[in-house]
């Protein structure tokens, strides 16, 4: 994987700007990211382009708001494919999305400790 999942400088900046409310955002992301990943994988398996599009779009947006630009970029790549009406997502992209999600969840979990 060539790009890191989380931009440390952007993450720190968002943390400073949001103060204590940032922990709430982190908690929401910790709940939503694994669920969104599972929904994306299920939508690909079930050939459900509508779910694939909407969930990848949500993931992209929420990741961008916390500085997880690498993960957002991978979600956007899936969003763009699904926007064209396809669920034919390259396996490497799904693997990269899964790995990036794991990285972001690890970083966010450590932040709450």
Language-model-detected regions and their locations in the chain:
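Two-component system phosphorelay core
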Residues: 1-54, 58-113
